Every structure is written in structure tokens, then in C-alpha cells.
A protein has these predicted regions:
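A structural signal for short, well-ordered beta-strand segments and their strand-loop junctions
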Residues: 33-36, 115-117
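Glycine-rich active-site loop/strand segments that organize a redox cofactor
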Residues: 37-99
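Short glycine-/acidic-enriched loop or helix-start segments at secondary-structure transitions
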Residues: 20, 44, 125
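Generic structural signal for beta-strand residues in well-ordered domains
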Residues: 1-3, 25, 113, 125
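Feature captures the FAD/FMN-dependent oxidoreductase FAD-binding
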Residues: 74-139
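N-terminal Rossmann-like FAD-binding beta1-loop-alpha1 element of flavoenzymes
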Residues: 3-33
Length: 139
């Protein structure tokens, strides 16, 4: 069975682990990986009701509170998608859950450390380390 060593591993690709993965991009000497059993990114797909708003400020995106100059900020997402000026002109205090899900997906697509179709079968702690077992490898 193939073995891979990382300094940090995360199980799941939700907002918390996406935030950690995005912030770790600047840490060149840290080997890390995040594993999600889903085939691609999705966030609360069953809760994307029309008009549903995020209950927190868009300023609390994945990176801005820690690194406001990060290329993974919500503002960078708006610029990339050519929606910055319409967003600013609308003076939106809150954003839709659907737009935030699009932002999360945009970030997820840019993070090579996030692996999909990676179902963790077992987690063990041995010899001072955690070991994650998959069907085809151990991390």
C-alpha cells in the first residue's frame, strides 16, 4: 500500500478546512492535505433556498480576518467574477447563501491540497503520529 507523509491532514472540505488550506498556501515548508469523500466541492446544497441570506458578515470569509491581502478573499472572488462594482453599488450588508457557496467553490478549485473522492476509512494514532487509511494508501 502506498504511503504519504504530511505535517497536517484534515478530513472534510468544509469552510473551516478550506480556510486552513487557503491560509497554509503561504507556508512553503509545511506538507499538508485535506481529504473529502465527495466527488467535488459542495456546501449545504439542500439549503440553497431562494433568498436565503448568510447570517454572518461577508467580511468573515475564509481568509480576510487573518490575511486581508490573500488571493482567496471574498473581494478577490468578486473581482475575478466581475461582480465587484455591482456588489459595492448595491451596498449589501449580507450576501446570499448561494453566492457564498459559489465563493467557497471558487476557492476550493484553486487549492491543490484539497483532494476529492478520498474516503478516509480509518484513523489510528501510533508511534506519536496519526495515520489515515484509505482504500489505496496510508497518510
Amino acid at each position: 500500500m502506498n504511503q504519504q507523509h504530511v505535517n497536517l491532514a484534515g478530513i472534510g472540505a468544509g469552510p473551516f478546512n478550506l480556510s486552513v488550506a487557503a491560509l497554509l498556501q503561504k507556508c512553503r515548508n509545511t506538507r499538508y492535505a485535506f481529504f473529502d469523500k465527495k466527488p467535488e466541492f459542495s456546501w449545504h446544497s439542500g439549503l440553497m433556498l431562494p433568498g436565503a441570506k448568510l447570517q454572518t458578515s461577508w467580511m468573515k470569509d475564509l481568509v480576510t480576518p487573518v490575511d486581508p491581502t490573500s488571493p482567496y478573499s471574498f473581494l478577490k472572488f468578486l473581482v475575478e467574477k466581475r461582480r465587484f462594482y455591482s456588489f459595492i453599488n448595491a451596498e449589501q450588508a449580507s450576501i446570499s447563501r448561494q453566492e457564498f457557496a459559489q465563493y467557497l467553490g471558487w476557492v476550493a478549485q484553486q487549492l491543490p491540497a484539497v483532494q476529492y473522492n478520498a474516503h478516509v476509512r480509518e484513523v489510528n494514532y501510533q508511534q506519536g503520529r496519526f495515520w489515515l487509511r484509505f482504500d489505496d494508501r496510508i497518510v
